[in-house]
């Protein structure tokens, strides 16, 4: 199966440099105040109501698990297919983001984030007129007001960044628009990428950073999920990396060295507060699978997970929240099903490469009509057991034949527990997802609850940003080796990248970093944007999607 390529998603919605109407630009969110809601005058005449209004803006941060009509964004890439859903399953499996239910990623995103931006603009425009809460001191009032203004600026910048990824540079609105006013004279010309990203988003993040909550305050339980100073620097690191990448560098003017500098700025300024989740057992051995799992599922409350930087705070979840992405043998609906393409990207547990050659998408090279890349015989890789003796992150991410999980072991042989006859939700790839699915929910007949907070940025990304940028500046070097080795070591992979003779050039290391970034952040909504900024979306999204069949005797064969 191939996925059709939508190289520039925003072209589907904005086909020219001018926009034609107020409704086209801003959707329906400029409708007048419903009669059953508080008016702006009521909200901004009371400090407590103003605070509630502001904190509600955090709800515009989205959770990525099953967010697109029960489907994940990575199901629209080469990393997975989706088995559960109606129109969206068909749309995503053929790469049609705009057809059927898959359209929600484009249409809903536009209105969703512009609503969030409007709330930010309302807060920023009117907070100075809100009277002080009589119960607060003047110092507290001024301190809180400063924090809320900075948070609104951060959130607005983040919302604009998410819109940029999908639509390119669009109108920058920093005022509260009047639905009865003349909008066409001001908001019909799109800014350049530099004006939109460098001059606005990056400047907003940099200038609001000092006024945000400091680390100590933002990472307490009472402030859980609030925007803190490290988040602004972390988001700048992500955006700078994008702007230095081939897709955007000529428009932005940002260099790889500048991107490296911002990643290093985070490490220097906040590195004592953050770290990879890296627990050891009683003997000092790394708990690779547990570390990788906990990096996402352990909450950041009270510093219990120092890897998480920026996240969406949520209540605990239950069986109903994860059912759509659990194996059918467990009573679930299949959902996100990893591809063999993803499985092929993982190294061996000893740090060696199972295949001889990798391309700029991070994937091994599939030659001609072969579904199996050329195997590196020194690695010990066996395609009859493609998950055996691999990077522990594979076992923490993918449920494969024989894996112990939930109430039993995975069995995807035809007609068996996880691939029963007549069940349309059975995996089309031979795999189910394990990452981001809290297994504690399955306890006591699925009556458990657990946190599954959506991580937007974690410390591993800052390290990977630094490694990628430094390789582009200097080629393979100590800074690159150090970042990659730390990320791989905490996952339980032995051997230093510096000792790999197959990674001795900038080009080879680039392909390796693309591979490492893909598997480290798989199903965290990175791949679909990374392949575009690397200018390799055509190669990544037009190739066949592979899976496996498991015969009655357990024999493995690949399939398209």
Map each language-model feature to its residues:
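Glycine-rich, aromatic-lined ligand/substrate-binding cores of catalytic
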Residues: 305-419, 475-476
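Long, intrinsically disordered, low-complexity segments
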Residues: 22-23, 58, 83, 113-116, ...
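Bacterial Sec-dependent N-terminal signal peptides
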Residues: 1-34
């Amino acid at each position: 199966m191939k996925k059709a390529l939508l190289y520039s998603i925003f072209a589907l919605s904005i086909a020219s440099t001018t926009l034609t109407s107020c409704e086209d630009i801003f959707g329906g969110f400029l409708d007048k105040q419903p009669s059953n809601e508080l008016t702006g005058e009521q909200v901004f005449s009371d400090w407590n109501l103003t605070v509630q209004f502001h904190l509600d803006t955090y709800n515009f941060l989205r959770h990525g698990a099953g967010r697109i009509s029960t489907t994940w964004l990575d199901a629209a890439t080469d990393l997975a297919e989706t088995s559960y859903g109606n129109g969206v399953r068909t749309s995503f499996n053929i790469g049609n983001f705009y057809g059927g239910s898959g359209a929600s990623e484009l249409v809903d995103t536009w209105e969703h984030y512009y609503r969030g931006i409007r709330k930010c603009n309302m807060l920023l425009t009117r907070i100075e007129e809100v009277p002080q809460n009589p119960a607060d001191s003047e110092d507290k009032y001024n301190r809180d007001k400063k924090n809320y203004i900075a948070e609104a600026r951060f959130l607005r910048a983040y919302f604009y960044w998410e819109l940029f990824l999908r639509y390119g540079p669009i109108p920058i609105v920093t005022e509260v628009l009047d639905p009865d006013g003349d909008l066409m004279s001001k908001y019909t010309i799109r800014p350049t990428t530099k004006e939109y990203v460098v001059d606005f988003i990056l400047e907003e993040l940099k200038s609001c950073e000092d006024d945000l909550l400091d680390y100590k305050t933002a990472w307490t339980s009472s402030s859980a999920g609030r925007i803190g100073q490290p988040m602004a620097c972390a988001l700048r690191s992500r955006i700078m990396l994008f702007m230095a990448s081939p897709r955007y560098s000529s428009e932005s003017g940002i260099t790889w060295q500048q991107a490296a500098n911002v990643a290093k700025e985070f490490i220097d300024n906040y590195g004592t507060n953050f770290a990879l989740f890296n627990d050891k057992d009683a003997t000092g051995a790394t708990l690779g699978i547990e570390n990788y799992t906990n990096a996402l599922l352990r909450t950041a409350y009270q510093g219990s997970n120092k890897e998480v930087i920026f996240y969406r705070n949520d209540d605990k979840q239950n069986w109903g929240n994860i059912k759509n992405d659990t194996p059918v043998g467990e009573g679930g609906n299949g959902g996100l099903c990893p591809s063999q393409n993803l499985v092929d990207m993982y190294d061996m547990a000893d740090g060696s490469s199972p295949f001889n050659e990798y391309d700029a998408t991070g994937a091994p090279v599939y030659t001609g009509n072969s579904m199996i890349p050329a195997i590196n015989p020194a690695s010990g890789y066996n395609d009859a057991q493609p998950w055996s003796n691999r990077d522990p992150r594979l076992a923490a991410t993918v449920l494969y034949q024989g894996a112990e999980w939930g109430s039993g072991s995975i069995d995807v042989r035809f007609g068996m527990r996880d691939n029963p006859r007549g069940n349309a939700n059975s995996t089309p790839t031979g795999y189910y997802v394990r990452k981001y699915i809290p297994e504690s929910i399955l306890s006591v007949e699925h009556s458990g609850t657990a946190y599954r907070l959506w991580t937007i940025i974690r410390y591993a990304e800052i390290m990977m940003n630094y490694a990628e940028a430094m390789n582009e500046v200097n080629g393979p070097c100590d800074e690159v080796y150090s970042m990659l080795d730390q990320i791989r070591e905490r996952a339980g992979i032995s051997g230093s990248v510096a000792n790999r003779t197959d990674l001795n050039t900038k080009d080879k290391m680039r392909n390796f970093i693309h591979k490492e970034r893909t598997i480290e952040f798989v199903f965290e909504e990175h791949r679909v944007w990374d392949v575009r900024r690397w200018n390799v979306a055509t190669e990544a999204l037009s190739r066949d999607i592979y899976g496996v069949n498991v015969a009655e005797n357990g024999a493995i064969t690949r399939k398209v």
